[in-house]
C-alpha cells in the first residue's frame, strides 16, 4: 500500500496547488506524519486555514506570511490529533478567526492513543460543524462530511468550486491511516470510505502525503486492503494464534517490530469489527483477550 510517489516541497514555503488552494508543510516528520502536517490555505481574499498543525512558531509564522494582506476568516480542523489542531488557538489569537470543527465531548473520555501524535484533549471549537454543513467565504464554499473511523470526530471538507476534498487522515497520500480503539473504529472507517465513493470529488488533498488524482481507485484499494487484512486474521486464528500479539507476529512479519504495538491496536480495531459482525467471538478484553472463529 506504500506505493505513492514522493512530492517536492520546502518547509516554510507555500505551494500553489490550485487557483484557490495553497499548502504549507509543518516540520514534524515522523512514522505517523510522513513529511509533516500539510496545512491548506483556501481562498484569495477571505482565507480559510485547514488543519493549522502542531504548536510550532515557525509554521505559525509561515501561515501568517503566506496569507499576506488577506484576512484569515476561518480556522478549520479535520480532527483533534496533536499534529492537526493545537496551532488553532495561537493562530486565532493573532487573527481573531473562529475555529470550526466537529465536536464530541464524550470523545475526551474514551481516548487512549499512545500512538500517532496523541489527542488534543483541550480543543473546543467556536463553531460546531455537522455533516452536510456549508462553510462559506468570499470565493469558496466548503461542505463538511463527517467521516468517523480514524477518530470519532473526523471531518473531511469538500471545496465545491474546485471539486477538491480535503481528506485529513481519513484518506492519506502515503499510507493507510491508523485506527486506534476505543475512539478509532474500523467498522465506522469502512463505512466512511464507502461514503466517499458516493461523491464526485476529482482530487483529494490529504493532510499527510501527496495529492490523490484518482481518489475512487485509492479508496477502493483501501477497502480491499482492510478486507484482506481480516482474512489474514481469520487464517491466523485458524492456525492456532488466538491472541493479538501472536497474530501480529505473523501478519506483520515484514514490518519493523518497533511498529508492532501500533499494529496490535490496528488488529484490535479489526477484531472489534469482526466480533460486532459475528464473524469471530472473544473471551476477555483488549490486547490480552483470546479470539476464536464462530
Question: Where do the protein language model's features map onto the residues?
Answer:
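Residue-level signal for inorganic ion chemistry
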Residues: 20, 63, 208, 233, ...
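Histidine-centered divalent metal-coordination motifs
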Residues: 78-84, 150, 208, 270
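Conserved beta-strand hairpin/beta-sheet module of binuclear metal-dependent hydrolase folds
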Residues: 7, 11-70, 156-168, 173
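Active-site HxH/HxHxD metal-binding segment of metal-dependent hydrolases
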Residues: 35, 54-139, 163
Amino acid at each position: 500500500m506504500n506505493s505513492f510517489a514522493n512530492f517536492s516541497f520546502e518547509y516554510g514555503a507555500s505551494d500553489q496547488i490550485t487557483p484557490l488552494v495553497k499548502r504549507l508543510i509543518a516540520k514534524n516528520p515522523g512514522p505517523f506524519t510522513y513529511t509533516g502536517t500539510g496545512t491548506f490555505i483556501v481562498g484569495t481574499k477571505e482565507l480559510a486555514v485547514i488543519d493549522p498543525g502542531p504548536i510550532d512558531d515557525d509554521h505559525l509564522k509561515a501561515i501568517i506570511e503566506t496569507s499576506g494582506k488577506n484576512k484569515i476568516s476561518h480556522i478549520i480542523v479535520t480532527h483533534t490529533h496533536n499534529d492537526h489542531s493545537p496551532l488553532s488557538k495561537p493562530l486565532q489569537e493573532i487573527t481573531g478567526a473562529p475555529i470550526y470543527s466537529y465536536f464530541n465531548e464524550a470523545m475526551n473520555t474514551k481516548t487512549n492513543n499512545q500512538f500517532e501524535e496523541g489527542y488534543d484533549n483541550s480543543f473546543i471549537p467556536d463553531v460546531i460543524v455537522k455533516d452536510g454543513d456549508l462553510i462559506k467565504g468570499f470565493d469558496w464554499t466548503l461542505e463538511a462530511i463527517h467521516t468517523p473511523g480514524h477518530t470519532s470526530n473526523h471531518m473531511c471538507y469538500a471545496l465545491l468550486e474546485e471539486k477538491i476534498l480535503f481528506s485529513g487522515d481519513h484518506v492519506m497520500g502515503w499510507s493507510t491511516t491508523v485506527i486506534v480503539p476505543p475512539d478509532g473504529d474500523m467498522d465506522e472507517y469502512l463505512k466512511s470510505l464507502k461514503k466517499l465513493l458516493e461523491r464526485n470529488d476529482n482530487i483529494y488533498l490529504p493532510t499527510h502525503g501527496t495529492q490523490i488524482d484518482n481518489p475512487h481507485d485509492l479508496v477502493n484499494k483501501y477497502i480491499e486492503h482492510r478486507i484482506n487484512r481480516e482474512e489474514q486474521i481469520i487464517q491466523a486464528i485458524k492456525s492456532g494464534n488466538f491472541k493479538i500479539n501472536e497474530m501480529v507476529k505473523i501478519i506483520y512479519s515484514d514490518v519493523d517490530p518497533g511498529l508492532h504495538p501500533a499494529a496490535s491496536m490496528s488488529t484490535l480495531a479489526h477484531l472489534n469489527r469482526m466480533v460486532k459482525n459475528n464473524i469471530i467471538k472473544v473471551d476477555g478484553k483488549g490486547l490480552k483477550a483470546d479470539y476464536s472463529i464462530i
